[in-house]
From Swiss-Prot:
InterPro entries: Isoprenoid_synthase_dom_sf. Keywords: Lyase, Metal-binding. Terpene synthase; part of the gene cluster that mediates the biosynthesis of the trisnorsesquiterpene discodiene which has a function during later stages of multicellular development, during the transition from fingers to Mexican hats. The terpene synthase tps8 converts its substrate farnesyl diphosphate (FDP) into the bicyclic sesquiterpene alcohol discoidol. The cytochrome P450 monooxygenase cyp521A1 then catalyzes the oxidative degradation of discoidol to form the trisnorsesquiterpene discodiene. Pathway: Sesquiterpene biosynthesis. Disruption phenotype: Impairs the production of discoidol and discodiene, and leads to delayed multicellular development. The gene is tps8. It catalyses: (2E,6E)-farnesyl diphosphate + H2O = discoidol + diphosphate. One of its GO terms (biological process) is sesquiterpene biosynthetic process. A motif (DDxx(x)D/E motif) lies at residues 96-101. A motif (NDxxSxxxD/E motif) lies at residues 224-232. It comes from the Eukaryota. This is Terpene synthase 8. The keyword Metal-binding applies.
Length: 312
């Protein structure tokens, strides 16, 4: 393709182009948690610790409606599990929006965050360890250990991606996925919604599991990038593959069609490798629930676009 490589997005290059996402259908059903009101009634009290004044906290809750997103993302857990997952989701959005995306922090911030004994924790450093302790109370130790590792990996990746503008318009979807894999957040989300399930390393290291999980992430990446494109159109970073593809093709419409085409392929791959995985380990009850949980999460993630203010 004959075009100059871009490291930032300029919406003025695409003025008057229509944003219309082609229709697609997921084969998995979404559900909603019966505990959604329990969290929504407590959300304001929870998030105010991260803001300098109460009005800012109120504005954040109204603008984002994370409670609605949580109800769709985590519909299968018991109340204790749902509450900690919902708090973590709020925590991640606020940490990313106000800390990591500010580009004012280096990795030493994460070093301090992950040091439980640090005497210089900010509200995020204090809260993340309270959340981890809560996960240990309701989840499986090995799965919570994995969640903590995934959180640290996500944090370091998010700081690097936001600060150093490593993404550019020359990337293929595979290159883009490899660049965004850490900061996108699907790994930590998968760890949080499956913290009560135990899937052994032997299974996680198998070819079929790695393929299944890769396509689960790719599927959600395309759902995210198509669903959030309109919201992110004013942001200059190329942390959205629709932007990357639009620069390559000179058209937002063609880029959206391309990304939905990828999504449809990834949906088929998720089902293909989940079937192979269940056939490979037919007597593993946690594995079947793990797969079902991630498919249900994906359906809820998709439903969240157009349902909560954050994505409108």
């Amino acid at each position: 393709m004959d075009y100059d490589i871009k490291f930032t997005w300029d919406k003025n290059q695409f003025l008057d182009q229509e944003i219309r996402i082609p229709k697609y259908t997921l084969p998995w059903d979404f559900k909603s948690s019966p505990f959604d009101k329990d969290f929504e009634n407590q959300e304001m009290e929870y998030v105010k610790q991260f803001f300098q004044n109460y009005e800012n906290a109120v504005n954040y809750v109204k603008k984002n409606e994370i409670g609605k997103i949580a109800a769709l993302n985590f519909p299968l857990g018991e109340k204790d599990e749902y509450m900690v997952n919902s708090k973590l989701l709020d925590f991640l959005f606020i940490l990313d929006d106000y800390i990591y995306e500010s580009r004012n922090y280096e990795e030493d911030y994460v070093d301090n965050l992950m040091d439980r004994s640090s005497k210089s924790h900010d509200p995020f450093g204090r809260e993340i360890w309270r959340l981890f302790d809560e996960y240990y109370r309701v989840g499986v130790k090995e799965s919570v250990d994995l969640l903590i590792r995934d959180f640290e990996y996500w944090s370091r990746s998010a700081i690097k991606t936001n600060k150093y503008k490593s993404l550019n318009s020359s990337l293929s979807i595979e290159d883009y996925f490899n660049s965004r894999h850490g900061d996108f957040g699907m790994t930590i989300t998968a760890s949080s919604c499956t913290s009560t399930l135990y899937v052994e390393n032997e299974i996680r290291e198998s070819k079929n599991f790695k393929k299944f999980f890769k396509y689960f992430e790719l599927c959600n990446l395309m759902i995210n990038d198509c669903g959030s494109f309109k919201m992110e159109i004013n942001e200059i970073l190329l942390t959205n593959f629709v932007k990357v593809r639009a620069i390559q093709l000179g058209s937002i419409d063609l880029a959206l069609k391309y990304c939905v085409g990828l999504l449809n392929k990834y949906i088929i791959k998720v089902d293909k490798y989940s079937t192979k995985l269940e056939q490979q380990y037919p007597n593993h009850s946690h594995l079947k629930k793990y797969i079902y949980t991630l498919k249900t999460f994906t359906a809820g993630h998709n439903k969240g676009y157009g349902h909560a203010n954050r994505y409108n």
